[in-house]
Amino acid sequence: MFNTHCKSVQEYSQRSANNMADTVLMVVLSIQQNWLSVGEQMTDVRTNKLDSKFLWGNKIKTYEYLMSNKHKMFAQIKAVLNSGRTYDEKAFSLMTIFLRVDGLGLPKAGFCCQLIAGMVGCMDVHNIKLYDIDPKMLKLNPKPKTSKAIEANNSRTKTYID
């Protein structure tokens, strides 16, 4: 399934800034939602934009960020993917791009990396239980102000990638 569907999603996502934003939006809409409802949510957001009943709380901020920054994000993502960097360097750079999106933490940034680039993955509540991972290890300081806090976030991101 991964080799078939994820490759198709990657090709779609890497075709344009709008497609990439669609993929990130799908990831965001899946937060605290039944996966089977995400298609309906996508249709509603595409039709109603900010007036969609599925955009609430942080999802509004995320949508606004995506609409304002999708071209910049897409250019950055393509630059990373086309670079000669190692897998880990690319994965860290992509995670950094996605973690700038309002509303995305490590698991959903990892899901974006998985769907758009075939890297990292989504360590969601189901996988946390399956792999017996401490949920605290998936939390980042949302506004790190010191070099120590920034390094702690970077360290957690690198650990997440591994």
Question: What residue spans do the PLM features occupy?
Answer:
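Short, flexible active-site loops
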Residues: D22-M26, K49-L50, L94, A109-C113
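A basic, often C-terminal nucleic-acid-binding module that engages the phosphate backbone, implemented
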Residues: V28-L29, L140-D162
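Catalytic phosphate/metal-binding cores of nucleic-acid and nucleotide-processing enzymes, i.e., regions
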Residues: F2-E11, R15-A17, N82-T86, F92
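Short, hydrophobic/amphipathic alpha-helical patches that form generic packing surfaces
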Residues: D22-N34, Y63-S68, Q114, D162
